[in-house]
Regions:
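Tryptophan-paired
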Residues: 1-31, 102-182
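A short, Gly/Thr-enriched small/hydrophobic beta-strand-prone motif that recurs across taxa
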Residues: 82-97
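Short helix-to-loop capping/linker segments positioned immediately adjacent to catalytic or ligand/cofactor-binding
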Residues: 79-80, 99-102
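A residue-level signal for beta-strand positions that form part of recognition/binding surfaces
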Residues: 78, 89, 108
Length: 182
């Protein structure tokens, strides 16, 4: 439910954050640590942050976030703004070379992407500390021919972030494949 607020007539820098409508499925469990907004607080010192996975040193994917800052004259103009996406989407699909059924010895797959920003500045959307690793699972298709994920959203990355595919086998072994992304 929207609540009305009243501001004195004047020019303000309006900060807009939001999530766009989705055309295709996205990762179902995104999370962010929200900024701690207080009356009289300095928004340039507030951040949206990654939330750590409690079981290890990785972080969860984030919401699909859009942002802009736009001056607006309250009292004489409608509030509206064109917003820009401040995250990147990633979809991974793993298949056999021959598009056949994946090996029954595979227990599961997980993706790790390194070099991801720890947080985004609330006022500028600038990324900070691009050293974190985000992880997410891949899911086996109903026909058993591929493992994939719904699109995950990530904060901006450093140049050439490291992509790591971790394949867990039913015999307890793990195989890891990695390469930098362009």
């Amino acid at each position: 439910k929207n609540r009305e607020i009243s501001l004195p007539v004047g020019t303000y820098n309006m900060i807009y954050w939001g999530t766009p409508k989705y055309e295709e499925p996205i990762y179902s469990n995104p999370v962010v640590v929200d900024p701690q907004i207080t009356i009289g607080g300095d928004l340039s010192q507030q951040y949206f942050g990654l939330r750590k996975v409690s079981a290890d040193t990785t972080y969860y994917p984030v919401f699909d976030l859009v942002y802009t800052v736009k001056p607006a004259h309250i009292g004489t103009e409608e509030l509206s703004a064109a917003m820009q996406r401040v995250v990147a989407g990633l979809k991974v699909i793993v298949k056999n070379k021959n598009n056949g059924i994946l090996s029954s010895s595979i227990a599961g797959m997980e993706v790790h992407v390194g070099g991801i920003a720890e947080k985004l500045n609330m006022y500028t959307a600038a990324p900070v500390n691009q050293t974190k690793t985000v992880s997410f699972p891949l899911v086996l298709s109903a026909d058993g021919t591929q493992m994939s994920n719904a699109t995950v959203m990530l904060f901006p990355s450093s140049a050439k972030p490291m992509f790591k595919l971790i394949i867990k086998l039913k015999n307890g072994n793990t195989k890891v494949y990695q390469q930098p992304l362009d």
